[in-house]
Design a protein with these regions (language model features):
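ATP-binding N-lobe of GHMP and related small-molecule kinases
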Residues: 1-93, 111, 115-117, 295-298, ...
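Glycine-rich, charge-dense phosphate/pyrophosphate-binding loop(s)
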Residues: 208-303
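FAD-binding core of FAD-dependent oxidoreductases
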Residues: 12-14, 18-25, 92-102, 130-145
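Alpha/beta catalytic cores of group-transfer enzymes, especially the acyltransferase/condensing modules
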Residues: 117-164, 251, 257
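Acyltransferase
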Residues: 164-241, 245
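Short beta-strand-to-turn element immediately C-terminal to the catalytic PLP-Schiff-base lysine
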Residues: 35, 139-141, 145-150, 261-265, ...
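Solvent-exposed alpha-helices and their adjacent loops that cap or buttress functional pockets
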Residues: 14, 23-26, 75-76, 129-130, ...
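DPxDG-like acidic metal-binding loop motif
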Residues: 28, 95-119, 140-142, 150
């Protein structure tokens, strides 16, 4: 029998102005084991997020992505497969739960196939499954990633900030489906808004690489997606304001939401920032919890 243990990080896409382009990995992890067994069929054990409804069939990304690599390398060799998941990444909250499942499955199958594919090749497969690379890239590589498509092929550049940052992820109880969140975004935007975001995304990368974090307050601003999604997250403008008033550089919608993520200095009072944001959600009849996180710099790995 063959078995592999995988750790895969949560991710936060967009990072404010970098819609469908920028992403980061943080130190909140799902742990998954994949075991090839003599017993036919698929078995699944889940602890934590999704334990009450994840099944080993249908659209289960952890199985489907595993089989995508396994079948391509082994020419469809039939196997029994047992998967055990310890899920800490909240589902449908904008922290990359689907990307973590995709990347875990691809990486596990690849490990059991003697690393047949490179990570860059896995990025291409993951993007085909997910539809865009901004979450799967940081899950694979760790750090901050800048992703782009060229001739229908995904590419990503990993970078590490010059100085540490803290990320305060405030997670409302209410889920927000990516499909619904995407429907809120118009198909066209004013040219001036596109220019606005280009300048902010460029400033964000420059601030991270140079360590000039005083620019993050402005660099994390956005006009391409967050204004159109704001009505889907109760009290969002006030949550942003509370984060900044409590000492964060700024706050953004993490991925498609509903999580709101504040960026802060390690010297900031992150508990104060988190509680200020939680209090605003509570004032809008929305319970929320929070995680104070660091950047993950490794991405998916065997443990």
């Amino acid at each position: 029998m063959k078995k592999v243990f995988i750790q895969v990080p949560a991710t936060s896409a967009n990072c404010g102005p970098g819609f469908d382009t920028l992403g980061l990995a943080c130190n909140l992890y799902n742990e998954v084991s994949y075991e090839i067994t003599d017993r036919k069929g698929f078995q699944l054990e889940v602890e934590g997020e999704g334990a009450d409804y994840l099944k080993p069939f249908g659209r289960n990304l952890a199985f489907a992505s595993f089989l995508r690599v396994w079948n391509s390398v082994t020419c469809g060799q039939r196997i029994g497969l047992k998967v055990k998941m310890l899920n800490r990444i909240p589902m449908s909250r904008g922290l990359g739960s689907s990307s973590s499942a995709i990347v875990a499955g691809l990486f596990a199958a690849n490990a059991l196939c003697d690393d047949y594919y490179t990570k860059d090749e896995l990025l291409g497969i993951a993007t085909e499954i997910e539809g865009h690379p901004d979450n799967v890239a940081p899950a694979l590589y760790g750090g901050f990633t800048i992703s782009y498509m060229e001739q229908e092929k995904a590419h990503s550049l990993r970078l590490l900030p010059a100085k540490p940052l803290k990320f305060i992820a405030v997670v409302p109880d209410s889920k927000l489906l990516t499909s619904l969140s995407r429907q809120a975004i118009p198909k066209t935007v004013p040219h001036k808004d596109a220019v606005y975001n280009t300048s902010r995304a460029s400033l964000l990368v420059g601030a991270l690489l140079s360590g000039n974090y005083e620019y993050l307050g402005m660099a994390l601003e956005d006009k391409l997606h967050q204004p159109y999604r704001a009505h889907l997250i109760p009290g969002l403008p006030d949550v942003f304001a509370a984060a900044k008033e409590a000492g964060a550089y700024n706050a953004i919608i993490s991925g498609a939401g509903s999580t709101v993520m504040a960026y802060a200095s390690p010297e900031a009072d992150c508990e104060r920032i988190a509680k200020a944001m939680v209090d605003v959600f509570a004032a809008n009849n929305e319970h929320a919890c929070y995680h104070i996180l660091d950047l993950d710099t490794e991405g998916v790995k065997k443990i």
